[in-house]
Amino acid sequence: MSHSTHPVTDRLPGIEAVLVALLAGVAGVAGSFAVAAFTPAFIAGPIAGFMARTLPGALITFSIVVLGDLGSQLNVLLAVGLSTTIFAVAALLGQAVGQRTAYPIAGVVAAATTALISVAITAAPTPSVVAGVATGTVVLLSDLSQSQAVSSHTADLSAGRRRLLAAVASAASLGIGGYVLGSQQSTQVSPPTLEGAQPWAAPEIEPLLAEAAEKSLGVSGLEPLVSDRFYEVDINSTDPTLDATSWSLTVTGTVDRELSYSYEDILSMEVDHQFVSLRCVGEALNGKKMDNALWTGVSIMDLVEPAGLPEDCCVMLRAADGFYEEFPLSALQDGFLAVGMNGEPLPRGHGYPARALIPGHWGEINVKWLTEIEILEEEQDGYWEERGWHGTGPVNTVAKLHVINTLDDGRKQVGGHAYAGVRGIDRVEVSTDGGDTWADATLSEPLPGTDVWRQWTYTYDPPGGEHEVVVRATDGMGALQPEEKSSPFPSGPSGWVTKTVR
């Protein structure tokens, strides 16, 4: 046996040290997740957000248009991988220090370094300490395992193998445990208890939701008029967690006087309940990022007009997650500040404690986690405009085809949703022969409100064999949806939806 200063680590092959470090990194990430769950306090959250904000606009556009939801998932996976690598470096540092001292110090150094790095990235002490302990534990247990093997004069290969197996076992235990604990945590936030101030529980909400259920066409597989899986699109992979008791909304910029509103101020105002649909500018033509909900809130103009507004220009909405969007001040006239959704407090993923709703416009300007309304004297680029998008205008008219059912009598039933913003939907037509002939679809009765979608359905005898079904909509102004297809980038998708039916 070698008589070096520290035979345990001197005998350790480099590849084994790296593998142990990577396993320790996995445990550290799991430890962070166990406490933080999928919030900004989770180590991968800020890293994923940083990548999303700093990657070239062309790459972000490719991810949105080509990869869709897969792009967001890959961003998270890459962030987890980078987090693991960062913690692995801390584990390697611990092993390097351990070569020059007694072996237990390696785990301590790895733990301390991991915790310090995590705090610097997340500003969250508790998840960082747990991440450090998890990382250090794997390093410590693997060192102890090999130390026992060396002390008993076990062969080098066996000692190295024991070290690696100890790292695998401890990392697996900590990793699985951390994932289970983190997954079981609720990432929702509850509104503060304010006596008598729960506008989302108003008695008129249940009848409105019941009306929407009644007006839904009941087509199998078709999402109802009030969406049960409302889409979410954000610039970060983790949503901010805001405390409503300390949250405030400010009105700033070129105003006569700046104003600030607390959550309690908002809830004490006269509220309204509105059905409003939203559609993502970056979705595919027949994608599923278009939904509808019953929102509870107050008029944005009631908040900004007391500040004294200029004649005309524009407004910048800023959010707690670093997002910001600019659009004409005129679009704010019918703006709505939502604090409730479908009879519940606004969910965290949809902007708790408050979000903006700008009727008839693409989803990107309906800013979540709203903290500031800045009135501008001249135009500025918003977050997505800086990346080449132009999604601050009115939404394009669309009729989507999401359901193709075969009925018991052999007939085909197709269905979907149609939406044209505040222009409304007057008509949906269906062609079952590739666009040669057209027939009117059945539309759901309109919901109360000016910015809502409608369901449509059409049943027909199939011609036999493969055929093309095409759908198109006419808005409430009498304008037919344009036929020519366009990419989501930069101003949103357009065109008639076509599907092959067999």
State where each predicted segment sits:
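Alpha-helical membrane-embedded segments
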Residues: 132-145, 170-184
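A short hydrophobic/aromatic micro-motif that marks alpha-helical segments and, especially, helix-coil
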Residues: 70-73, 175, 375
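Hydrophobic alpha-helical membrane-embedded or membrane-associated segments
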Residues: 20-28, 83, 110-111, 135, ...
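Juxtamembrane/interface segments at transmembrane-helix termini
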Residues: 145-152, 182-190
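N-terminal secretory signal peptides
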Residues: 2, 83-159
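Membrane-anchoring hydrophobic segments
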Residues: 1-102
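N-terminal secretory signal peptides and thylakoid transit peptides that target proteins
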Residues: 153-173
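Structured, non-membrane catalytic/scaffold regions adjacent to prosthetic-group chemistry
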Residues: 84, 184-502
